[in-house]
């Protein structure tokens, strides 16, 4: 949720953010109008309430002649106070609802535009020139006995799969390597619940424009998470953290679930776009003044992991119109996929500033003793999709795949060889 005080002081900043996102600027004027009306209604309620208390005290001291008039006024004030309170509460609810519908204010130097207007920050490595026609990850996965989408569909439906044999070992190796790296960098490992309450899902900003992506269990009124960012953000809801505890860094390992609504016909082959996958996610509570630098650190840790799996990748600065509701700035790392001849996202890291903490009421105690909202940040350190990039970039002509050196202790093999299909 955006900062109402900051909006009053600099409404043009939100207008510029809305323009950059391609969103409606008029919401700024509606917010200011509602805020003004709410404050006026609140002032009227407080004035009437003060008068009501004063009249109540005066009745006991009044003469017989004065008492009747005071009692009549007290009766009238009771009705007026009730009406004024109801008006103030209604305007407060309307203002809060509108505030919660507005996306985070983007950083001023974020690229302007939509999904195709990202800026390439850097390209790392050179896409390999094959002297044979490279196979895609699904063909390789089937040859290696690593991926079984046919039985996944039989058991669960489209966009489900089994990781089998070396496929399971590759994923476990990736996730374990990511956890090891994160712990070495000062993160506390967490295995969070994957079902959360509505207030937690909404507090992180995933029940707005992303609501169609989320699995809901109506009988229990719980939501399946699409990322461990959600439970990790809710972990300190309604708490005040000591300033000297910041940054507080968590690394979460969880299964993730996404409906992939609106993606009909996209990435139907293989395991690039699926309903269930595993992910290791970094999540940080930081001092707002240090959030920008912390964001760059998260990006650097993502890049270290990508360097370890030895695939060509690029870093892109996502345009404002393609940012999620909660993000003020986002960087993606995209790996080269030989079978598609293009880069595909493997990681993302977002600076959500105080947007989520304001919705979840997460604060820190500043040096002056006053509670202030923390900044929250997140970043992917490994996920199932990385297997796609590893198989395709490290494949050999016979269908074998060279295992990146960093993963060999986990997989137990230097090279994965095709097996006879069962």
UniProtKB/Swiss-Prot annotation:
<keyword id="KW-0030">Aminoacyl-tRNA synthetase</keyword>
<dbReference type="GO" id="GO:0004828">
    <property type="term" value="F:serine-tRNA ligase activity"/>
</dbReference>
<feature type="binding site">
    <location>
        <position position="274"/>
    </location>
    <ligand>
        <name>ATP</name>
    </ligand>
</feature>
<dbReference type="GO" id="GO:0005737">
    <property type="term" value="C:cytoplasm"/>
</dbReference>
<comment type="similarity">
    <text>Belongs to the class-II aminoacyl-tRNA synthetase family. Type-1 seryl-tRNA synthetase subfamily.</text>
</comment>
<dbReference type="InterPro" id="IPR033729">
    <property type="entry name" value="SerRS_core"/>
</dbReference>
<protein>
    <recommendedName>
        <fullName>Serine--tRNA ligase</fullName>
        <ecNumber>6.1.1.11</ecNumber>
    </recommendedName>
</protein>
<keyword id="KW-0436">Ligase</keyword>
<dbReference type="GO" id="GO:0016260">
    <property type="term" value="P:selenocysteine biosynthetic process"/>
</dbReference>
<comment type="subunit">
    <text>Homodimer. The tRNA molecule binds across the dimer.</text>
</comment>
<dbReference type="InterPro" id="IPR006195">
    <property type="entry name" value="aa-tRNA-synth_II"/>
</dbReference>
<feature type="binding site">
    <location>
        <begin position="227"/>
        <end position="229"/>
    </location>
    <ligand>
        <name>L-serine</name>
    </ligand>
</feature>
<keyword id="KW-0648">Protein biosynthesis</keyword>
<dbReference type="InterPro" id="IPR042103">
    <property type="entry name" value="SerRS_1_N_sf"/>
</dbReference>
<dbReference type="InterPro" id="IPR002314">
    <property type="entry name" value="aa-tRNA-synt_IIb"/>
</dbReference>
<dbReference type="Pfam" id="PF02403">
    <property type="entry name" value="Seryl_tRNA_N"/>
</dbReference>
<feature type="binding site">
    <location>
        <begin position="258"/>
        <end position="260"/>
    </location>
    <ligand>
        <name>ATP</name>
    </ligand>
</feature>
<keyword id="KW-0547">Nucleotide-binding</keyword>
<dbReference type="GO" id="GO:0005524">
    <property type="term" value="F:ATP binding"/>
</dbReference>
<comment type="function">
    <text>Catalyzes the attachment of serine to tRNA(Ser). Is also able to aminoacylate tRNA(Sec) with serine, to form the misacylated tRNA L-seryl-tRNA(Sec), which will be further converted into selenocysteinyl-tRNA(Sec).</text>
</comment>
<dbReference type="Pfam" id="PF00587">
    <property type="entry name" value="tRNA-synt_2b"/>
</dbReference>
<keyword id="KW-0963">Cytoplasm</keyword>
<comment type="pathway">
    <text>Aminoacyl-tRNA biosynthesis; selenocysteinyl-tRNA(Sec) biosynthesis; L-seryl-tRNA(Sec) from L-serine and tRNA(Sec): step 1/1.</text>
</comment>
<feature type="binding site">
    <location>
        <begin position="345"/>
        <end position="348"/>
    </location>
    <ligand>
        <name>ATP</name>
    </ligand>
</feature>
<dbReference type="InterPro" id="IPR002317">
    <property type="entry name" value="Ser-tRNA-ligase_type_1"/>
</dbReference>
<dbReference type="GO" id="GO:0006434">
    <property type="term" value="P:seryl-tRNA aminoacylation"/>
</dbReference>
<keyword id="KW-0067">ATP-binding</keyword>
<feature type="binding site">
    <location>
        <position position="380"/>
    </location>
    <ligand>
        <name>L-serine</name>
    </ligand>
</feature>
<feature type="binding site">
    <location>
        <position position="281"/>
    </location>
    <ligand>
        <name>L-serine</name>
    </ligand>
</feature>
<dbReference type="InterPro" id="IPR045864">
    <property type="entry name" value="aa-tRNA-synth_II/BPL/LPL"/>
</dbReference>
<dbReference type="InterPro" id="IPR010978">
    <property type="entry name" value="tRNA-bd_arm"/>
</dbReference>
<dbReference type="InterPro" id="IPR015866">
    <property type="entry name" value="Ser-tRNA-synth_1_N"/>
</dbReference>
């Amino acid at each position: 949720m955006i900062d109402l005080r900051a909006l009053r002081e600099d409404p043009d900043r939100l207008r510029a953010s809305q323009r950059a996102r391609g969103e409606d600027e008029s919401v700024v004027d509606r917010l200011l109008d509602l805020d003004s009306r709410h404050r006026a209604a609140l002032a009227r309620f407080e004035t009437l309430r003060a008068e009501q208390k004063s009249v109540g005290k005066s009745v006991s001291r009044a003469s017989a002649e004065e008492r009747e008039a005071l009692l009549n006024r007290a009766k009238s004030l009771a009705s007026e106070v009730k009406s004024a309170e109801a008006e103030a509460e209604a305007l407060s609810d309307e203002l809060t609802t509108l505030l919660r519908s507005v996306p985070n204010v983007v950083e001023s130097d974020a690229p302007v535009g939509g999904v195709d207007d990202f800026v390439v920050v850097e390209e790392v490595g050179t896409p390999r020139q094959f002297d044979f026609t490279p196979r895609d990850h699904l063909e390789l996965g089937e040859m290696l006995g690593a991926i079984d989408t046919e039985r996944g569909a039989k058991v669960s439906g489209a966009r489900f799969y089994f990781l089998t044999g070396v496929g399971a070992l590759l994923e476990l190796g990736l996730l374990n390597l990511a956890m090891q790296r994160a712990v070495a960098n000062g993160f506390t490992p967490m295995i969070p619940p994957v079902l959360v309450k509505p207030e937690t899902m909404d507090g992180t900003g995933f029940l707005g424009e992303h609501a169609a992506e989320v699995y809901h269990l109506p009988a229990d009124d719980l939501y399946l998470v699409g990322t461990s960012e959600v439970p990790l953000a809710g972990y300190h809801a309604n708490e005040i953290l000591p300033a000297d505890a910041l940054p507080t860094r968590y690394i979460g390992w969880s299964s993730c679930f996404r409906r992939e609504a609106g993606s009909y016909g996209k990435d139907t082959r293989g395991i690039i776009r699926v309903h269930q996958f595993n992910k290791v996610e970094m999540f940080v509570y930081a001092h707002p003044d240090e959030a920008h630098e912390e964001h760059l650190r998260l990006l650097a840790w993502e890049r270290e992991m990508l360097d370890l799996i030895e695939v060509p990748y690029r870093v892109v600065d996502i345009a404002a119109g393609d940012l999620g509701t909660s993000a003020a700035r986002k960087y993606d790392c995209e790996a080269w996929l030989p079978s598609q001849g293009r880069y595909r996202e493997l990681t993302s890291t977002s600076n959500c500033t105080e947007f989520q903490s304001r919705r979840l009421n997460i604060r820190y105690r500043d040096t002056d003793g006053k509670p202030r909202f923390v900044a929250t940040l997140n970043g992917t350190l490994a996920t199932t999709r990385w297997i796609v990039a590893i198989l395709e970039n490290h494949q050999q002509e016979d269908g074998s795949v060279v295992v990146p050196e960093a993963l060999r202790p986990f997989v137990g093999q230097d090279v994965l060889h095709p097996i006879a299909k069962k």
